[in-house]
Amino acid sequence: MSVNYMRLLCLMACCFSVCLAYRPSGNSYRSGGYGEYIKPVETAEAQAAALTNAAGAAASSAKLDGADWYALNRYGWEQGKPLLVKPYGPLDNLYAAALPPRAFVAEIDPVFKRNSYGGAYGERTVTLNTGSKLAVSAA
């Protein structure tokens, strides 16, 4: 995610929390005032949760984008379970946004890091570790 998308997401989260915090009462026969009491603690918690989720999605997307998808998919086929629906390409930013709230990609095994040389002619062979995996931890 670029900085502009992150700013837009934070602005939308703040506007959404303000809209939810101020709700006029629907019943005109009520003895209270026009609006209900706004609890600043709940509003601040909602804003913090939205910002944490956005930061988690950005961190997950950045870590997942640095993986060597060909080696990861080949490892899945060797184990008998294909890990990706498509045999090519990284998952987009929507995958990171679809993760559970406050979920982060904790660790990507170094064996699946993307090759800095591009992997064309003279690609080095990768010895895959049978214990290698993508780990996602929800807080």
Curated annotation (Swiss-Prot):
Q: Does the keyword Secreted apply?
A: yes
Q: What range does the record give for the signal peptide?
A: 1-21
Q: Does the keyword Secreted apply?
A: yes
What cellular component GO annotations does this protein have?
egg chorion; extracellular region
Q: Which GO terms describe its biological process?
A: chorion-containing eggshell formation; dorsal appendage formation
Compartments, record wording = Secreted
Which keywords has UniProt assigned to this entry? Answer: Secreted, Signal
Function (record text): Chorion membrane (egg shell) protein; plays a role in protecting the egg from the environment.
- Which protein family is named in the record? Belongs to the chorion protein S16 family.
Q: What is this protein called?
A: Chorion protein S16
Gene behind this chain?
Answer: Cp16
